[in-house]
């Protein structure tokens, strides 16, 4: 807290707080294993998270959905142990945690490829903290349904905008007098009402409106992007969407 006092957070307190906030989806109390971490340290961390999972499950005396979080670092056997133990509690959904913590892309992909389709088919599958368009495509391809990430708003605050043709950096000089919207095919509030030049001007002046408009656009882009993924799965055209995203977003 702001006064500097130390607070003890337990699994029970975590659940109590989430219930008080009225969370639509609650998460168990867990430890996000750092990277790099050797197998002994990772296993100890995983076991602590499993212990807290049991306590979180017992503390939830409501009908609010509670998700389990699979830990185990970069070790497939530990991930599988974590998953098998969590399944015993029949959580309303299952999340992959402990990724996007500094590990190389190839390691993260290996973990997702190994564990993604092992998650229960009848429960939501949630990948925590991963949000680049190409990473989302890869994860969906391996059975993941849900994501959360700071990328849309954090990148917006730094002038990086996601468009149907790839990334646009509004701080580039070439946009100084560009009277087009951020993305001419976008129907978000920012694109319908403001030009690239004006948003760039606001950003250069450190006007908070710039960050808000760019955040509105990026969040809208991601909502539309997930809609395109759902539609492509229904229409059996996911591979075509994957090729398009690879073409536009391979560099980030």
Where would I find each of the regions flagged by the language model?
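Glycine-rich phosphate/ribose-binding loops and adjacent secondary-structure elements
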Residues: 47-50, 59-182
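Short capping/connector residues at structural and topological boundaries
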Residues: 3, 13-14, 104-106, 166-167, ...
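Glycine- and acidic
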Residues: 35-36, 43, 93-100, 208-211
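C-terminal extensions of enzymes
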Residues: 20, 29-36, 183-252
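Structural signal for hydrophobic packing residues in well-ordered secondary-structure cores
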Residues: 22, 53, 57-60, 90, ...
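Generic structural signal for well-ordered, non-membrane alpha-helical segments
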Residues: 7, 11, 42-49, 79, ...
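Non-catalytic, usually N-terminal nucleic-acid engagement modules in DNA/RNA processing proteins
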Residues: 1-61, 173-176
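Alpha-helical packing segments of well-folded alpha/beta enzyme cores
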Residues: 14, 45, 49-52, 56, ...
């Amino acid at each position: 807290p702001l006064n500097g006092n130390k607070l003890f957070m337990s699994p029970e307190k975590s659940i109590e707080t989430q219930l008080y906030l009225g969370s639509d989806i609650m998460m168990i109390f867990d430890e996000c294993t750092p990277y790099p971490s050797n197998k002994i340290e990772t296993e100890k961390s995983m076991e602590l998270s499993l212990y807290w999972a049991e306590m979180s499950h017992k503390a939830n005396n409501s009908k609010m959905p509670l998700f389990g979080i699979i830990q185990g670092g970069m070790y497939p056997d530990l991930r599988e142990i974590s998953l098998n133990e969590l399944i015993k509690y029949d959580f309303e959904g299952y999340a992959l945690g402990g990724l996007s913590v500094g590990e190389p892309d190839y390691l993260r992909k290996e973990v997702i490829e190994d564990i993604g389709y092992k998650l229960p088919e009848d429960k939501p599958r949630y990948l925590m903290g991963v949000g680049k368009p190409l990473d989302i495509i890869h994860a969906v391809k391996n059975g993941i349904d849900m994501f959360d990430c700071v990328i849309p708003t954090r990148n917006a605050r730094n002038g990086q905008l996601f468009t149907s043709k790839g990334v646009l950096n509004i701080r580039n000089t070439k946009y100084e007098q560009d009277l087009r919207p951020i993305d001419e095919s976008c129907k978000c509030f920012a694109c319908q009402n403001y030009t690239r030049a004006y948003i760039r001007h606001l950003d250069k002046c450190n006007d908070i409106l710039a960050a808000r408009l760019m955040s509105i656009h990026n969040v809208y882009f991601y909502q539309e992007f997930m809609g395109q993924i759902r539609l492509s799965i229904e229409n059996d055209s996911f591979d075509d969407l994957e090729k398009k995203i690879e073409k536009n977003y391979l560099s980030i």
